[in-house]
């Protein structure tokens, strides 16, 4: 192994050390693997749901967000939004949805790769996955704000509704409508994965830092 590669990946664990303290080195690997698996599972799970309460629909209308699509009463909600000048929901986050599946798979691969890196560079590999839940919420809030603040002035009810920002995490109200958001399974799987990554980093540092320091000061 070249010196540059060794600086990046870190020292190998001596066979006698691995035999004596096997759990110390396996725990961070298992935590990283579990985090990667949860992210992969989250792709098929819903991340966020919005209930729209409207006088015309006593039971409410629902739209459910997966990482790569929106399902539910999308057409009905678009029909109501048309009157206040809001764009169709399928125009939101088109780029994000197109890369989401491959992006999450790539994040999971980086987490798995982190199990083979024994230096501080491991943090860079897992950092994107660590902040994925925050990135998801921030992007979702961006699009909600973008749609709510850019209403079509030519819409039938545009004069009766001021631009607004629909909240992503709490109840919102506009005219006679109210929105009730809810975080779902996919999001919580990603949050759990982030927690496993944090714990994995703790055990990773505890396991490999002594080896790195010993390599620097033989």
Where in the sequence are the language-model features?
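N-terminal signal-anchor transmembrane alpha helix
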Residues: 22-51
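Membrane-proximal N-terminal segments immediately preceding the first transmembrane helix
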Residues: 6-16, 77-84
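Cytosolic juxtamembrane amphipathic/interface segments immediately preceding
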Residues: 10-23, 175-176
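Structural signature of transmembrane alpha-helix termini at the membrane-water interface
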Residues: 41-51, 112-115, 135-145, 199-209
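Mature, soluble, non-transmembrane domains
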Residues: 117-151, 171-172
């Amino acid at each position: 192994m070249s010196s540059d590669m060794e600086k990046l990946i870190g020292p190998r664990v001596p066979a006698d050390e691995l035999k004596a303290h096997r759990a110390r080195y396996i725990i961070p690997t298992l935590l990283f693997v579990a985090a990667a698996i949860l992210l992969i599972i989250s792709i098929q799970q819903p991340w966020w749901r919005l209930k729209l309460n409207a006088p015309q629909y006593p039971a409410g209308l629902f739209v459910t967000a997966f990482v790569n699509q929106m399902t539910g009463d999308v057409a009905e909600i678009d029909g109501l939004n048309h009157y206040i000048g809001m764009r169709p929901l399928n125009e939101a986050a088109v780029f994000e949805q197109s890369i989401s599946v491959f992006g999450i798979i790539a994040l999971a691969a980086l987490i798995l790769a982190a199990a083979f890196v024994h230096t501080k560079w491991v943090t860079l590999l897992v950092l994107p996955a660590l902040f994925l839940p925050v990135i998801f919420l921030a992007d979702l809030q961006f699009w909600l704000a973008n749609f709510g603040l850019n209403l079509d002035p030519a819409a039938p009810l545009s004069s009766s509704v001021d631009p607004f920002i629909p909240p992503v995490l709490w109840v919102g109200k506009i005219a006679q409508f109210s929105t009730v958001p809810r975080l779902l399974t996919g999001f919580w799987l990603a949050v759990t994965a982030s927690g496993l990554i944090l714990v994995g980093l703790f055990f990773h540092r505890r396991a490999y830092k002594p080896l790195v320091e010993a390599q620097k000061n033989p």
